[in-house]
Amino acid sequence: LWDTSVVQWGEIDIWINNAGQNTTRVFSWETDGTCTENIIKTNLIGMIYGSQIAATGMLKQGHGAIYSMEGLGSNNMVQPKTILYGTTKHALTYFMRGLAKELEGTNVIAGRLSPGMVLTDFITKTPDGKRSEVFSDEKFRKTFNILADKPETVAKYFVPRILKNLKNDAQIAWLTNRKAAWRFMTAGFRKDRLI
């Protein structure tokens, strides 16, 4: 991926690890071994490999920024039936903060992107492509319609901030605690807006 990108664009200024996988919404002991391995390989090992490749290439070229996409678990929140996903995102945050420390004194920075809840197939479909049970979970639907956004909304917020950021170990957060509180206070205006 790095080599192909360098051939296409010459240099890579920004690298974003955004691959993510989830399990079906079941308790951790009900998740089969293959699903457990896949989520760890995608969310954690893939992010680590991507970061290693990017750091090596960016240190050679003399500059760059590496970001990884946080998620549920990055903020220490524990949500039943999502703990395998949350565990990988908690580890992702630790890794990226550690990578930032290791990159201190270089012209390469590492940071984290915190999008909040985003309406993608990740939420609306199961890992095998079927319609997710979130549509029938009334509590989840209500919360999702209050807090979630479309990908293009979050991207419009992230892109200019990523381009301007020069700070190592930065967290660029879309759905802040303050914004979430405001959305709950104005929840009556957000009914069924996404799902």
What is the predicted function of each stretch?
Residues 1-10:
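Conserved amphipathic alpha-helix within the SDR
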Residues 22-37, 81:
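Conserved mid-core segment of classical short-chain dehydrogenase/reductases
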Residues 51-52, 97:
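A short, exposed helix-loop element centered on a Lys and neighboring polar residues
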Residues 67-91, 96-97, 101-104, 117:
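Catalytic loop of short-chain dehydrogenase/reductase
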Residues 112, 130-184, 188:
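C-terminal helical subdomain
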